[in-house]
Amino acid sequence: VPLKRRDSFRFQQSFLSYLAINPLQNFAATLSLRQPSYNEDRARALYPILSNWMEWSETEQMQFRRTIGPRSTAVESRPNIVILQCESFSMYKSSMSGNPLNTTPFVDSLSRKGIFFERCFAPTFSTARALFAILTGVPDAQLFKFSSRNPKALNQYTLINSLEGYEKHYFLGGDAEFNNFEGVLQNVEGLQMHTGQRPSIPPINVWGISDKDLLHEAHTLFNRAKGPFFAYIQTAGNHRPFQR
């Protein structure tokens, strides 16, 4: 029986998993992370632009803290919060970007009727970069690959931890070890992981169970909730390859 990609992720160490996938390629790629560089002069030169974009009041000293007070009493009602990350949903192709083709009218309607975070973005492609940006509120600017695979970038703050008294759930149809999603998710305290193989739900491709089954699973759990909950549902059905 030929080995499948997920067979490489049975190890406890992510390095061994990536080594098993493609030893030579991953060995060469990992060399780029031996000495991560930080160019302070370049950072200081670009700081005024970043400071203006982030609306920082103090611009003389180079600091990256931004404090925003509560703007409504919505959280005081302790609502259930569900974030649904749609795989390969390109912003520039959507109606929200002003695309004249009006490709996503229903999602555009949701963005206008709800809260649209227009400054939450990842600087380039990759599901891992999007996950990092959404959880931390910081764009993944890792030059090589992405921050989820850089041990020095994994320890991040997330606003989700300030939801006191909430159950916290993460749903993925496949394995969260892929691209070390799990490393980023470990920043969420008390997070319950619903990933990997399900005994009663067959996988449909290399990414695991279907998005429909994933959403049904989440809905079933939500109906049993005894208190407020936060959930992050990450779809994968729009990601190649689509076959097993």
PLM regions: where:
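N-terminal secretory/membrane-targeting segments
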Residues: 1-79, 96, 111-114, 119
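Solvent-exposed soluble domains appended to multi-pass membrane proteins
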Residues: 54-244
